[in-house]
């Protein structure tokens, strides 16, 4: 299997990662660190999918750089909330290329993807230290956003244009739309990270447990996800492997990965003794949790047998009123990253936006060519093929794909009929990707 990084290269990349300021976002130093994280993410996925030694995870743990990764992710999140909207409102901002802006928007997704891979392991949660609290808060923000958009019907069923497809000529308004679509993907990854944190809750501080159960009432958030199931569109489509895909008739009752993660997180937060002692089973929480009984069918339990224990627990809960937890006087740690970033930059958002528009997001032709060249090296398509865990699926019907779109090389089909049927939906992304590849090739020719 192809490799993105050798062990020694990865160690150098991880050792060089540093915390940056909001003003630094998009700078050459930031862009170089973004490239490092992209490559580390690719290598981590390659190792995990091939059941190889996960040296990327080991290096992040041993070098103590997981907090740096979490800080970079939340820094980008704050930038997207506070600075990006102000950039979009600047009427005199007409950049030659919006590509660098998209890289910043995509940065958060890259990091949560990397965290999804490395936080699967208990030692990663332990090595994250106090920033697990920040990670819990981050996951809560994303999951409540996911529930809210699902309830209001705001979740787009279009596939997002990826970083290898985006055209440098896309408008700022196009980027806003892509950013909104990317939030859904990020929220799905945040669910994975939360699930892994609940797996390792015994080895984490009581503050983490209190944050999940008392501050954020995560069990009730998870109940909302079971009820609304934002990764399903009726019985026809499911969101899997980063795309909306048609569901085969024989798979309609099958639990998806995301369904399983919600149930596992509920099992961890409801059945572990420390959690039961900490959680307040008041009348509201009890009513919410008992809604789960309607979803615990024999078909579901057959796929996740441990859910039988949850079903028994809920039956017992329906007949009893658990004693409220003791409110002991304890000192609890609090998450700091989001609040510190906001406090440091309060009332400076517009000034930062103007500075970045002038000095960062309006690069010269030579700078654009250099970025295009480095991008081509980072996103090695031969290596990226190996990041797909299973055989490619037909974009129209969901069965195994055997041929890909000859124009963009980004979508697979099982036969010509499916390709023709799917063309109206695929055409916009196909055009963007074809234009991006053509533009990249032209810039590479100019630079050489």
Swiss-Prot record:
The alphabetized list of GO BP terms reads: inner dynein arm assembly; motile cilium assembly; outer dynein arm assembly; positive regulation of motile cilium assembly
Q: Which residues participate in Zn(2+) 1 binding?
A: 394, 397, 414, 418
Q: Where in the cell is it found?
A: Cytoplasm; Cytoplasm, Cytoskeleton, Microtubule organizing center, Centrosome, Centriolar satellite; Apical cell membrane; Dynein axonemal particle
Coarse class of the protein's main subcellular location:
cytoplasm
GO MF terms listed in the record are:
zinc ion binding
Q: Where are the zinc fingers (MYND-type)?
A: 394-430
Identify the domain of life: Eukaryota
Q: What happens when the gene is disrupted?
A: Ciliopathy phenotypes: appearance of 3 otoliths, kidney cysts and dilated kidney tubules at 2.5 days post-fertilization (dpf). Motile cilia in the kidney show disorganized cilia bundles with either severely reduced beat amplitude or paralysis. Olfactory motile cilia are nearly completely paralyzed.
Question: Is ATP-binding included in the keywords of this UniProt record?
Answer: no
Give the binding site residues for Zn(2+) 2: 405, 408, 426, 430
- Gene3D superfamilies from the xrefs? 6.10.140.2220
Q: Which UniProt keywords apply?
A: Cell membrane, Cytoplasm, Cytoskeleton, Membrane, Metal-binding, Zinc, Zinc-finger
Could you describe the subunit structure of this protein?
A: Interacts with LRRC6.
Q: What does this protein do?
A: Plays a role in axonemal structure organization and motility. Involved in axonemal pre-assembly of inner and outer dynein arms (IDA and ODA, respectively) for proper axoneme building for cilia motility. May act by indirectly regulating transcription of dynein proteins.
* Annotated family: Belongs to the ZMYND10 family.
Q: What is this protein called?
A: Zinc finger MYND domain-containing protein 10
Q: Which organism is it from?
A: Danio rerio (Zebrafish)
